[in-house]
Amino acid sequence: MSDKTYPVSAYWNERAYINAAKYKDMYKRSIEEPDLFWGEEGKRIDWIKPYTKVKNTSFDPANVDIRWFEDGITNVAYNCIDRHLATRGDQTAILFEGDDPADSRAITYKELHDSVCRLANVLKAHGVGKGDTVSLYLPMIPEAAFAMLACARIGAIHSVIFGGFSPDSLAGRIEGCRSKVLITADEGLRGGRKVPLKANADLAIAKTGDIVQTMIVVTRTGGAVDWVEGRDVRYEEAIAAASPECPLTEVEAEHPLFILYTSGSTGAPKGVVHCTGGYLVYASMTHQYVFDYHDGDVYWCTADVGWVTGHSYIVYGPLANGATTLMFEGVPNYPSVSRFWEVIDKHKVTIFYTAPTAIRALMGSGEAPVKKTSRASLRLLGSVGEPINPEAWEWYHRVVGEERCPIVDTWWQTETGGILITPLPGATPEKPGSATLPFFGVKPQVVDATGAVLEGVCEGNLVIADSWPGQMRTIFGDHDRFVQSYFSTYPGKYFTGDGCRRDADGYYWITGRVDDVINVSGHRLGTAEVESSLVAHELVSEAAVVGYPHDIKGQGIYAYVTLMNGIEPSDRLRTELVTWVRKDIGPIATPDVVHFATGLPKTRSGKIMRRILRKIAEKEFSALGDVSTLADPTIVDDLIRNRLG
């Protein structure tokens, strides 16, 4: 845990929407008078029929029921496009940066309206209406946003499936939400390689019987694909023939907007359901206040729309606010490790939101690839996806932001719809590695294993004591699982599944998933804490820590470590790292195994697959599960071959 604090600068105190005094006042009102507070904030979106009811929620396990603005009627596409046309129709809505640096284009709000209306009409022509589900299996191209908004325009429910998922994973998700239409592309592009999306989709549909009636195929590469007459539709031909005007479908605030599948600790993936009104209010509000978005900013979130971060902070939040949002098809290290910073200079990006895993990977290449670029346009940095260790935070702040850009280290989940714990750049002194303080309306508590609420400085499990508008409403088709997963462990509270520490200033430090806790000789250790210690060593680029069976301790600590470029593994360095962690955290945290690795198994979105690392450490090589979603599946073979202990 870092003891450094970075105060809010005078510039940010004066310029930001929210300063410290305003945060304190607004937060107090949001907790004490939620109906009044959210009744006002709900007006940030336009309503066809205004709401009269604001909050109607229950966390009682016998009756979990979450409703916000429930008697209001609106439309998400109207709020993200139509209402901006009169004042910013010619403003860029989406900046697209392709995998190839020569491939970029700007799409105005008028052009976005045209494309979305045409695709909405195509969907209607193929029998899609209000309440029907449409699955999207697309690369990071503007057509992904068009498809999401086209569904929203006609009241259809979209289910975006990450383009890195295997045919089996795709099939399971199509079956789960019974999509009659699938929108995909011939191929995707990622790091100079082609991804066979249409071929994968064909294999998936073959496994799902007659659920999918229509497959709409976007031409991305022009590569040869198999074609099923009567089922497959060429996107370009269909939209060219469609009308550029499509009337809005009025939907209730609680009408589902999308289903997004996320992994559960047990069983099949969970179809997280987010609804229209509360979700959009929360996505818009968090985007504006957390990133301090002002007209003229160029905002870039590096996530994929296949994940919730892409939904909330590439598409819905920014577009609801009339922003210019950048969509990036590529990867941080193609064609060079300067790519992120070159894109920032090319498009004059002012707000940059990325994942700690990307920052740590780029740290391994040193400062030179960053410093060869200007980055003068940047004014705010963000972090999302997992806790950022203090060393990566400091590097991000010093090297990328040149010590002038605050970092909003945001904590939230697929289930929360938007950011729950975060600094606000004009209000919150920052501590490297801490998500700091709750956003408006968010009531975090730290509880022990029995559910007793802990006060003051403490460590335990993180729960949220009351609802917020962006919260998921249910698991698609399985409300009992929703209640069991989130409200039964600590009845009356939403259980996040994360561990947490609270310091003397009331700041929250996320310590990692509770299922990423190692129990060493009866002592609980968060893996994030050990990983952070290892990465603090100057020769370490990345680290991932898991538990494995130990005859004496119950669980031992198995550390996978990748080194900085040019550093060779050695027994001496292994001993040095073990001593380093002992000194940093204490003898209880001593790694039993330090496994030097050439790389870690990551999904194409950059998430480290700790499940696979756990199985390798446990020698359960036959139980690795699906590795097809990994950016480089060959890393797994190398890790198995070199397993230690």
From Swiss-Prot:
PTM summary: Acetylated. Deacetylation by the SIR2-homolog deacetylase activates the enzyme.
Gene Ontology MF: a single term: acetate-CoA ligase activity
Binding site for ATP: 385-387, 409-414, 498, 513, 524
Gene Ontology terms describing biological process: acetyl-CoA biosynthetic process from acetate
Enzyme Commission code: 6.2.1.1
Record keywords: Acetylation, ATP-binding, Ligase, Magnesium, Metal-binding, Nucleotide-binding
Modified residues (N6-acetyllysine): 607
Cofactor: Mg(2+)
Binding residues for Mg(2+): 535, 537, 540
A Pfam family per the record: ACAS_N
Catalyzed chemical reaction(s): acetate + ATP + CoA = acetyl-CoA + AMP + diphosphate
Binding annotation for CoA: 190-193, 309, 333, 521, 582
Cysteines engaged in disulfide bonds, as pairs: none
GO cellular component, one term: cytosol
UniProt cross-references to SUPFAM superfamilies, sorted A to Z: Acetyl-CoA synthetase-like
PROSITE patterns (alphabetical): AMP_BINDING (PS00455)
Family: Belongs to the ATP-dependent AMP-binding enzyme family.
HAMAP family (UniProt xref): Ac_CoA_synth
Role noted for this protein: Catalyzes the conversion of acetate into acetyl-CoA (AcCoA), an essential intermediate at the junction of anabolic and catabolic pathways. AcsA undergoes a two-step reaction. In the first half reaction, AcsA combines acetate with ATP to form acetyl-adenylate (AcAMP) intermediate. In the second half reaction, it can then transfer the acetyl group from AcAMP to the sulfhydryl group of CoA, forming the product AcCoA.
Official protein name in the record: Acetyl-coenzyme A synthetase
Protein encoded by which gene: acsA
